[in-house]
Structure formats: C-alpha cells, structure tokens
UniProtKB/Swiss-Prot annotation:
Listed PANTHER family: UBX DOMAIN-CONTAINING PROTEIN 1 (PTHR46340:SF1)
Name of the featured protein: UBX domain-containing protein 1
Region (Disordered): 42-215
Main location: cytoplasm
Domain UBX: 214-291
Record's subcellular location: Cytoplasm
GO cellular component, one term: cytoplasm
Pfam families membership: UBA_7 (PF22562), UBX (PF00789)
Matching CDD domains: UBA_UBXN1, UBX_UBXN1
Organism: Danio rerio (Zebrafish)
Gene Ontology MF: a single term: K48-linked polyubiquitin modification-dependent protein binding
C-alpha cells in the first residue's frame, strides 16, 4: 500500500508523525520523493509539527472515503504487478529503502544548499554593484559641487578685477581731465599775475594774499595699515579718495575689506566720500589715514 509505505518510511527516517502525515496528505500520496521534497520546502513553517487536520470530506489518501482510516487500503490502488495484494517488505528490504531515501534526502539537501549558495553569491554581486553605482553618484555630485564652487570663485575674482580696473580707468580719466584743465589755464594765471602786484602800496591788504599760496596741486598721504606698517605716496589734489583706496588695496590690504579714517579730527570716510577730491575732503597738502576693519 503506497500511502502506508510512504508514511512508515518517513517515520523510520526519523521524521515526526505530524510532519510525516502532513507530507503524505499534501502530496496526495504520490511517493516518498514528493513527500521528502515537501518536508524540505516546509521545514521552517511555524505549524509544521502541529497535528494534521484533514479538510472536511477528505482524509490522508486522495481516493479514500471518510469512513476509511489512513492505514486502510483502497481497492483502486492495489498493486497490479504483484497480484491482488502487496507483499510486506522484509527487514533487509526496509533498511535498504530507508538508506536509499536517506541518500536521496541528503542529495536534495545538498542541491538546496548549493542553490542557496548561488543565490547568496548573486545577491552579494547585486549589493556590490548597487554600492558602486551609489559611490559613483556621490562622486559625481561632489565633482559637480566643486566645479560649481570653482566657477563661482573665478567669477568673483573676475568681477573684482573688473571693478578695480573701472576705478583705475576713472582715476586715469580724472587725471587726464585735470591735466587738460590746469594745463590750459596756466597762461591765464600768468596774465593775471601782474595786476595782483598793483596793491603793493597798501601793506594791510597785502597780508591777505598768503592764503592764495595754499592752493597746492599735490597731496602727500600717509596710510597706517592694520599690521602697523605705513604706506606713503603723493596724489594730485584733485584725485578722488578712491585713488587712495585702490593704492592701499594693491599694496597692503591683503584682500581684506577695510575703511579709511582720519584719527583727528576723527572721520570715517563713506562710499560717497570716495568720489570726492582730496582737496574737498581737507586732506591737502598732507594727511594721515588709518586703515580699520570694515
């Protein structure tokens, strides 16, 4: 009888009765190999060791009636090759069958372990591939960010150079305009000088003439830097204060932003003051400016 032989074989191999009965029932009594496959596939089921409860109207054998027990033999599955009844196996035959089934089970387990090993290798390959792709994405983002920062710095440096160049160009234009203005007016000053000597007979009035001599064309500026060192140079009296600022930027500011002040009387020069001539700011003929942090 096929079902009893399968169940007995599983029990002899050491499987629990509940597991063996479930394997026989769920495989439809289709042989020991199918039952063993089912046991290996479901060995981790939480209810694998619970008693088997057949569904309503069914028992362990698919062709059995409810009145039959799992050990009863249905007439429809009698062994036609051996006659009307299956001869019981001898002890030696039973041991050989158990050994064969154990070898089969070991082979199936080895196949499953190999399959799981291959699946593990594939999962590890996929994990490494995903890790490499993620690393490449991060590197690309970092490279893009560094490139963006470098472009921004180049842009800022270019804008700074252009701003300094505009100031230099303006200073050059102002110098040229002053040169043309004062160069053309020198003759008229020479022509008007003789009448200025006419009131020489009245000494009290001549004493008011010296203020006219204070109309200096040059201005000496001394600048005290943040580190205590000083810069000193000469500017035209009509040059704007921006010329002094550019001079400091090019010779001692070290790229820092700063203010220009006069210590006494104390005055902090603003951006509007940068366009005013040194004469108008009272820095002629000489002055001391101090650099302070902005």
């Amino acid at each position: 009888m096929a079902d009893c032989t399968t169940l007995d074989s599983l029990l002899e191999m050491g499987f629990g009765r509940n597991r063996a009965e479930k394997a026989v029932a769920h495989t439809g009594n289709q042989g020991i190999e199918r039952a063993m496959d089912w046991l290996m596939e479901h060995e981790n089921d939480p209810d694998i060791d619970e008693p088997y409860v057949p569904p309503a109207g069914n028992t362990l054998g698919p062709a059995e009636e409810q009145s039959q027990s799992p050990t009863e033999i249905p007439e429809s599955i009698e062994d036609t090759e051996e006659g009307n009844a299956r001869q019981p196996m001898t002890e030696e035959e039973r041991k050989e069958q158990v050994k064969r089934l154990e070898d089969l089970m070991k082979a199936r387990q080895e196949e499953r372990r190999e399959r799981e090993r291959q699946e593990g290798i594939e999962r590890e390959k996929q994990r490494r591939k995903q890790g490499q792709e993620l690393l490449q994405v991060r590197q690309k983002l970092q490279e893009d960010e560094m490139k963006k920062l470098a472009d921004q710095r180049r842009k800022e440096k270019m804008e700074d150079r252009l701003a300094k160049q505009r100031v230099k160009d303006k200073i050059a234009r102002d110098r040229e305009e002053r040169a043309q203005k004062f160069g053309g007016g020198s003759s008229s000053t020479g022509l008007s000088s003789p009448p200025a000597e006419a009131p020489a007979l009245s000494p009290p009035e001549n004493q008011g003439a010296p203020p006219a001599k204070k109309d200096y064309d040059d201005c000496r500026i001394q600048v005290r830097l943040l580190d205590g060192t000083t810069l000193s140079t000469v500017f035209k009296a009509q040059e704007p204060l921006a010329a002094v600022r550019v001079y400091v930027q090019m010779n001692g500011a070290n790229g820092q932003d700063f203010n220009l002040i006069t210590p006494y009387p104390r005055r902090v020069y603003t951006d509007l003051d940068m366009e005013k001539p040194l004469r108008e700011l009272g820095l002629v003929p000489s002055a001391v400016l101090v650099v302070t942090k902005k």
